[in-house]
């Protein structure tokens, strides 16, 4: 389902003003990636970057070029595990999230 521009703008605005929402979206992104829903997980991470750290700042902190990061987090992105972890760690730091792992039975 294609999202409307207004919906996207609403989500980005809420990420900026609601830390709990941003944390929930981060959790959703990681869960999607772990469940093999790569497109969805990368899309959510991209929204988090747009609304919080910005691609320019993420590039500065990770050492990747902005265009590389845009490609990495695109629907067709195929980041290596090392690069993806570097990006997610940087997003966590920016959002003040301390990840914890809980395994389901």
Regions found by a protein language model. Give the residues of each.
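N-terminal flexible/basic segments that precede or flank functional cores
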Residues: 1-44
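Short, charged recognition helix plus adjacent turn
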Residues: 5, 9, 97-105
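Short alpha-helical DNA-recognition segment
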Residues: 50-71
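DNA major-groove recognition helix of helix-turn-helix/homeodomain DNA-binding modules
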Residues: 82-98
């Amino acid at each position: 389902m294609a999202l409307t521009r207004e919906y996207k703008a609403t989500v980005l605005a809420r990420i900026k003003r609601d830390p709990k929402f941003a944390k929930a979206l981060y959790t959703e992104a990681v869960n999607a990636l772990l469940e093999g829903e790569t497109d969805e997980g990368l899309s959510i991470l991209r929204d988090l970057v747009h609304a919080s750290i910005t691609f320019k700042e993420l590039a500065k902190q990770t050492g990747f070029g902005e265009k590389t990061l845009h490609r990495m987090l695109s629907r067709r992105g195929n980041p290596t595990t090392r690069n993806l972890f570097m990006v997610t760690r940087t997003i966590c730091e920016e959002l003040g999230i301390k990840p914890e792992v809980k395994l389901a039975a």
